[in-house]
Amino acid sequence: MGLSDGEWQLVLNVWGKVEADLAGHGQDILIRLFKGHPETLEKFDKFKHLKTEADMKASEDLKKHGITVLTALGAILKKKGHHDAELKPLAQSHATKHKIPIKYLEFISEAIIHVLHSRHPAEFGADAQGAMNKALELFRKDIAAKYKELGFHG
């Protein structure tokens, strides 16, 4: 399941593009998530009222949350699989407070892959997509293990 050094490099190369515009990428990813899986919107009291893509694009709260999500994910990706310290508080909040099912993390992973490919087709070809998929799968597997430790089977 681990990634090679080359695969991590592909992940981090495209992540540099994400970090250059966290707000834009985060907004696009969350909009893609909410449009593709409207049930995920119900987990966000702040966003439940956002019914259209125009509403979502106009929401400063959604933009801020996108920055929060991608900042946390970036910190995890930069650890190249050695992310236990970063994962623990994230798993704690997502399992006990927000009760976010692992399935929803799969949905946002799909949204991330889609948005990165649409925004950076040259830098996010098949090899980079494969590497990012592996990195996100590793993240989900490890957070699922933390969920289990916390007694959450979402």
UniProtKB/Swiss-Prot annotation:
Pfam families: Globin
InterPro entries on file: Globin, Globin-like_sf, Myoglobin
GO biological-process terms attached to the record: removal of superoxide radicals
Coiled-coil zones: none
EC number: 1.7.-.-, 1.11.1.-
Phosphoserine sites (modified residues): 4
Keyword Metal-binding: yes
Keywords, in A-Z order: Cytoplasm, Heme, Iron, Metal-binding, Muscle protein, Oxidoreductase, Oxygen transport, Phosphoprotein, Transport
Residue positions binding O2: 65
GO cellular component labels: extracellular exosome; sarcoplasm
UniProt GO MF annotations: heme binding; metal ion binding; nitrite reductase activity; oxygen binding; oxygen carrier activity; peroxidase activity
Uppermost EC category: oxidoreductase
PROSITE patterns from the UniProt entry: GLOBIN (PS01033)
Catalytic reactions on record: Fe(III)-heme b-[protein] + nitric oxide + H2O = Fe(II)-heme b-[protein] + nitrite + 2 H(+); H2O2 + AH2 = A + 2 H2O
Record-listed heme b binding positions: 94
Known role: Monomeric heme protein which primary function is to store oxygen and facilitate its diffusion within muscle tissues. Reversibly binds oxygen through a pentacoordinated heme iron and enables its timely and efficient release as needed during periods of heightened demand. Depending on the oxidative conditions of tissues and cells, and in addition to its ability to bind oxygen, it also has a nitrite reductase activity whereby it regulates the production of bioactive nitric oxide.
Family (UniProt): Belongs to the globin family.
Assembly with partners or alone: Monomeric.
Name recorded for this polypeptide: Myoglobin
Organism: Peponocephala electra
Higher taxonomy: Eukaryota, Metazoa, Chordata, Craniata, Vertebrata
